[in-house]
Amino acid sequence: MSYYNSYYGGLGYGSGGYGGLGYGYGCGCGSFRRLGYGCGFGGYGGFGYGSGYGGFSSGSGYGGFGYGYRRPLSYGGYGFSTFY
């Protein structure tokens, strides 16, 4: 199910990742200032729904946004209803 409030704890609706300074639903590990729902790992300023590695495409694995996509990584970006 969705991984809200998971892992080490960042800011946001359900951030997961250590010290994600982003806001939105489910910031990833090391997210610095991304906004949107579900930023991914180490994406600086990535915005959108469920961003992956730190870009903004449309529903990509790494670096795409599109809420509800799946990413089998603990730090790899979880969106609106992603699966681990």
Curated annotation (Swiss-Prot):
The keyword Repeat applies. Induction: Expression in skin and hair follicle is regulated by HOXC13 and by GATA3. Residues 9-78 are annotated as: 24 X 2 AA repeats of G-[YCGS]. InterPro entries: KRTAP_type8/19/20/21/22, KRTAP_type_19. Keywords: Keratin, Repeat. Strong expression in narrowly defined pattern restricted to the lower and middle cortical regions of the hair shaft in both developing and cycling hair. During hair follicle regression (catagen), expression levels decrease until expression is no longer detectable in follicles at resting stage (telogen). GO terms for cellular component: cytosol; intermediate filament. In the hair cortex, hair keratin intermediate filaments are embedded in an interfilamentous matrix, consisting of hair keratin-associated proteins (KRTAP), which are essential for the formation of a rigid and resistant hair shaft through their extensive disulfide bond cross-linking with abundant cysteine residues of hair keratins. The matrix proteins include the high-sulfur and high-glycine-tyrosine keratins. PANTHER family: KERATIN-ASSOCIATED PROTEIN 19-3-RELATED, KERATIN-ASSOCIATED PROTEIN 19-4-RELATED. Interacts with hair keratins. Belongs to the KRTAP type 19 family. This is Keratin-associated protein 19-4. It comes from Mus musculus (Mouse). The lineage of its organism: Eukaryota, Metazoa, Chordata, Craniata, Vertebrata. The gene is Krtap19-4.
